[in-house]
């Protein structure tokens, strides 16, 4: 019998579930209730935040903490952005760990390459521990996760190259990291009375006669325009992986891949700021995740493979080191663009993300090697032979086929599970050029009153990023952007505003 633990599952039913999956999670399953509504009249505030994902909510909450009146506008009917979809961990170095700060910064520079803006990166590293404590102050239940420094070898409590345990990883005590962060931010947003206007898209950011930001023009779902007057605007709209035209223009090598991001990641904020003369950087830099669920774009995170999962092709054979940084290319170029991820019950028991997906019915299950092989329609004898060989290599702790450096599971805890995976666009690392104060830059310098945080920015993490660094950057720069925007609004309030141009 073939099932996922929730009744008989055909491949057709699994595909149907995948189609519904991303929308269900993005809609905020398990999230705190938030008072949201569309904008129905003109308004005035100190700071407008565009986007209600992790960086946007962080910016809004930080601005409110600084005493600013804030309005958040979100074009989608739900909140959470990409952050609510996060299933891994974030990075945060505790106070009193200067060596850890040095190691994290050097590793991020090594990973990001020559395009990394070190001044921007240094602020992420130095602010990472405080960002974690700040989230905890709003109820996030987070705990350390010991990981190796090598991004390709992240696992529980391994040693650094210098013999010390890395203390940089931060995970939730229960559940998934994305909902945990968004929940905490929503608690803070509610306590500060910050309104979130969903189904409200920004048409343009306006400036006064001297080029200073003075508000936004928005559209509601009925196509009606409203204006929000504000001396400061924070752009936190995410990347552009869901915009096929922008992907084709800037990252042609990833054309045809699905996006793992929120459907809201259409590059709106980049385009809005470019119309104001903003600079962009690293627009070609895109990370591809090797193991995403077809149709839904949900990811099976790196840790699943670290903890022992393997990949097989339609012949039932392994074809690569599952921890290789080139795994996505190997799946796409050498294996018809897809593969089967194989794991066992022990891994589901240990990993909240697998438990969550299992409950949603994404996995095919078999009580033996042969039964699972028949379920996924690969040659049963060859699949069994592959697993027998792999288990023997685990026993010897040596992968003589592909040189996989970690062999943590024999995959013999029945039942066994499989899920079809393929590469997908995971992060667009290019975007708006900012300075360490999160001010958006033009060729002439900072655009007065305009700030940005999160995946809408570029140069922050370079051409590649460490696992967990994206969440950390979103929170650290969200806090900076919100605080700086509030300070600018307070300064502008002391002077008489120039006449608005509306454009």
List each model region and its residues:
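Conserved redox-cofactor binding core of oxidoreductases
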Residues: 126-224, 243-246, 394-413
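Glycine-rich FAD pyrophosphate-binding loop
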Residues: 65-84
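C-terminal structured subdomain/cap of oxidoreductase catalytic cores
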Residues: 42, 59-62, 356, 430-492
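Glycine-rich active-site loop/strand segments that organize a redox cofactor
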Residues: 91-124
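Glycine-rich loop(s) and the adjacent beta-strand/alpha-helix scaffold that form part
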Residues: 221-293, 477-480, 484
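A glycine-rich dinucleotide-binding beta-alpha-beta segment and adjacent secondary-structure elements
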Residues: 204, 382-464
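An anion/pyrophosphate-binding glycine-rich loop and adjacent beta-alpha core
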Residues: 270-274, 278-382
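Beta1/beta-strand and adjacent pyrophosphate-binding region of the FAD-binding site
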Residues: 41-55, 71
């Amino acid at each position: 019998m073939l099932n996922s633990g929730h009744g008989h599952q055909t491949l057709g039913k699994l595909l149907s579930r995948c189609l519904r999956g991303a929308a269900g999670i993005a809609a905020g399953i398990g999230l705190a209730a938030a008072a949201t509504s569309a904008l129905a009249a003109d308004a005035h505030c100190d700071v407008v935040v565009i986007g209600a994902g992790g960086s946007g909510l962080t910016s809004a909450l930080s601005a409110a903490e600084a005493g600013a009146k804030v309005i958040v506008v979100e074009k989608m009917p739900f909140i959470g952005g990409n952050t609510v979809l996060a299933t891994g961990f974030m990075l945060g170095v505790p106070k009193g760990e200067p060596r850890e700060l040095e190691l994290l910064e050097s590793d991020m520079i090594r990973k990001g390459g020559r395009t990394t803006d070190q001044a921007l990166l240094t602020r992420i590293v130095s602010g990472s521990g405080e960002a974690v404590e700040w989230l905890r102050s709003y109820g996030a239940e987070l705990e350390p996760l010991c990981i190796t420094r090598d991004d390709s070898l992240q696992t529980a409590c391994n040693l650094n190259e210098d013999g010390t345990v890395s203390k940089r990883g931060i995970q939730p005590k229960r559940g998934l990291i994305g909902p945990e962060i968004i929940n905490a931010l929503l608690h803070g947003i509610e306590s500060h009375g910050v309104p979130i206007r969903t189904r409200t898209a920004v048409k343009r950011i306006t400036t006064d006669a001297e080029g200073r930001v003075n508000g936004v023009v928005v559209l509601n779902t009925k196509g009606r325009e409203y204006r929000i007057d504000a001396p400061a605007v924070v752009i936190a709209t995410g990347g552009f992986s869901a915009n096929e035209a922008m992907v084709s223009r800037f990252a042609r090598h990833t054309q045809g891949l699905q996006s793992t991001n929120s459907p809201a990641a259409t590059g709106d904020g980049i385009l809005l700021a470019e119309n104001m003369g903003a600079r962009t950087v690293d627009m070609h830099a895109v990370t591809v995740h090797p193991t995403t669920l077809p149709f839904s774009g949900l990811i099976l995170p790196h840790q699943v493979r670290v903890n022992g999962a393997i990949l097989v092709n339609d012949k039932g054979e392994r074809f690569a080191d599952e921890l290789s940084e080139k795994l996505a290319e190997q799946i796409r170029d050498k294996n018809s663009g897809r593969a089967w991820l194989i794991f066992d019950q022990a891994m589901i028991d240990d990993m909240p993300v697998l438990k969550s997906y299992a409950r949603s019915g994404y996995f095919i299950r078999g009580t033996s090697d042969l039964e699972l092989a028949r379920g996924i329609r690969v040659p049963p004898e060859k699949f069994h032979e592959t697993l027998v060989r792999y288990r023997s290599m685990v026993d010897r702790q040596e992968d003589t086929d592909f040189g996989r450096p970690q062999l943590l599971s024999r995959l013999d805890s029945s039942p066994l599970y499989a899920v079809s995976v393929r590469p997908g666009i995971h992060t667009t690392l290019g975007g708006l050029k900012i300075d360490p104060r999160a001010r958006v830059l033009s060729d002439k310098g900072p655009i007065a009153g305009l700030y940005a945080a999160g995946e809408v920015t570029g140069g922050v993490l370079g051409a590649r990023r460490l696992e967990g660094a994206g969440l950390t950057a979103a929170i650290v720069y969200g806090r900076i952007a919100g605080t700086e925007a509030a300070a600018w609004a307070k300064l502008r309030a002391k002077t008489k505003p120039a006449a608005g141009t509306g454009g």
